[in-house]
Structure formats: C-alpha cells, structure tokens
C-alpha cells in the first residue's frame, strides 16, 4: 500500500449523504411494501411485463436490506464486524439490485416495443413461460458475476476509521473486482442501447399512427415511455459516467489524493441517484401494471369515484401497460 493511499482521507464526511440515503430508503420501503401488497391482492394473468416488474420488485427488496447497513456504516457508528459485513455482502447487494434493475427495465422496453410495433405477431420472447425462463437466467448471470465478491477471502487488517472496502481485498479479490466493474459497464452499455432503440421504435410507431382510431391511448403510451427512459437516465447514466474513473482510483492507477477524494464523492452522489430507482419503481408499477393501478385506485379513490369507475365500460385493453400479446 502506498503512502498516498495510506494517508489520503477519502472516506470522510459521508454524513450528508446518509440523510439522503435514508430518505430514499424510507420512501422506497413504503412503495415496495405497497407494491407487494397490490400484486398479491390483485391476481394477475402473468403477462410478460408483470413478470418483469415482479422481478424488479424482488430486486428492490435486496436494496432495502442493504441500505440500512450502508447508512449505519457511513455514519461511522457501525462496529468493525458490521463494516466488514457491509464490504463483503451488503455493498454487493446494492450492485446486484442495480444491474437487475437495468436488465429488467430493458426487457420491459423490449416487450412494449413488440406489443406496439409488431402487434399482429406474437414472438416467443412475449410468452409468459419464456419471460419466466429469461428472468431466471438473468438472476443466475448477475449472481455469478457478483457473488464471488462476497466469498473471496479477505485480509485481516487493523481496525481504523478511514478504511475503504478495497483495503480488505487480497490481490485476487482486487482483480475480480476490477473485472466485475468492466463486465457491469458492458452490461450497462448493451442494455442502454436496447432501451434507447426499443423506445425510439415505439415513439416512431406511435407518431406514424397518431391519427389512427385504434390508438386512443397514444399520450398514455408516450408518457410510459418517457417515464421508463427518464428514470433510467436519471438513475443509472451519471453513476456509470463516474464508475470507470473511480475504479481506476481504487486500483491506484489514479493516485493523486485530491482527485481520488473528488471521484469518491462523485461516486457516492451518483450512487445516491442510482439507488433512487427504489423511489421511481412504484411509479413505473402504477403506469405499467393494471393490477397495481387498480389496487391504488381502490385504496385511495373515494367511494363515489369507485362507483363511477365500475359503471364505466371498459374502452381500453391496457395499452399503457403491456398490450395484448402476453
């Protein structure tokens, strides 16, 4: 370990971030619990989007398990063993959630694209059985990438206040961490391209059919696309703009102390945006899942509005959620 890394106070002054992480956690746990209750109460016919959203919700619960530990550690009040546990386990859970969220948002975009652009044809990818299979493959892939960071043996170091997770790693652990980061950036870039291309094709199709009587819900569909795209960009793009430079500072390719401190603070700020997907996801559930939307309406609408809603004939087939294929 070099003198620069030994005496560079990188991991100080994290308390301001913890308040925002706590706010995200509080909003997110309420939204996730309500979403779970809504999906359980309202039986769904397991359309593709519903399957992907349920997987997204499951990933969000991993994040709700990890955030309290991160908050306690960053406040500097965690015992030494909890700090080690955070570096080995809960920090990895945060990234498992992040990349599962990215991948399942991409599958939501693909499904909506096929529903609207190729509405007369059903592809295998649109079948519920295939959606369940691909979801299992996604979980397995992400876990195979991330779990080694949890189980690779770590070093025993003397207890101190200003310590980062990389300092616990042996040489093989550092190399695997570096490899994991580059794999995750590749996942981000590939699935970002999928989301952007899918949404572009949907917008183009909606624009071409803007005067068609069969497209009465164009505005709602566009709103859904904008929600998915905006939440994706806000949550995940800033973090990945910082991730590679920050990883290089962890491996001391970037050794200047002030630069390393700035990159760490930028990483924490953009990680805060990334975990804020925990707050955005319930909004996506509302717009993309009919079961969730109906349960929210039943819970918060007045009896008069509910009665009027029940008397109102169904004029749409949930264009804004998944379409008709699955």
Swiss-Prot record:
- A GO biological process held by the record: regulation of feeding behavior
Q: Which regions face the Extracellular side of the membrane?
A: 1-19, 70-89, 155-182, 243-268
Q: What superkingdom heads the lineage?
A: Eukaryota
Q: Provide the transmembrane region boundaries.
A: 20-40, 49-69, 90-110, 134-154, 183-203, 222-242, 269-289
The residues on the Cytoplasmic side of the membrane are 41-48, 111-133, 204-221, 290-326
Q: Name one GO cellular component term.
A: plasma membrane
Region annotated Disordered, chain positions: 305-326
Enumerate the Pfam families for this protein.
Answer: 7tm_1
User: How the protein sits in the membrane?
Assistant: Multi-pass membrane protein
Annotated S-S bridges: 87-165
* Basic and acidic residues bias (residue ranges): 307-318
Q: Where in the cell is it found?
A: Cell membrane
UniProt keyword list: Cell membrane, Disulfide bond, G-protein coupled receptor, Membrane, Receptor, Transducer, Transmembrane, Transmembrane helix
* One GO MF term attached to the UniProt entry: G protein-coupled peptide receptor activity
Task: Give the InterPro entries listed for this entry.
Answer: GPCR_Rhodpsn, GPCR_Rhodpsn_7TM, GPR171
What Gene3D superfamilies would the database entry show?
A: Rhodopsin 7-helix transmembrane proteins
Q: What PANTHER family would the database entry show?
A: G-PROTEIN COUPLED RECEPTOR 171, P2Y PURINOCEPTOR-RELATED G-PROTEIN COUPLED RECEPTOR
Main function: G-protein coupled receptor for Big LEN, a 16-amino acid neuropeptide produced from the precursor protein, proSAAS (encoded by PCSK1N). Acts through a G(i)-alpha-mediated pathway in response to Big LEN. Big LEN-GPR171 system plays an important role in regulating feeding and metabolism. Also plays a role in modulating fear and anxiety-like behaviors in the basolateral amygdala. Big LEN-GPR171 modulates the mu-type opioid receptor signaling and antinociception. Acts as a negative regulator T cell function.
What the record says about family reads: Belongs to the G-protein coupled receptor 1 family.
Q: What is this protein called?
A: G-protein coupled receptor 171
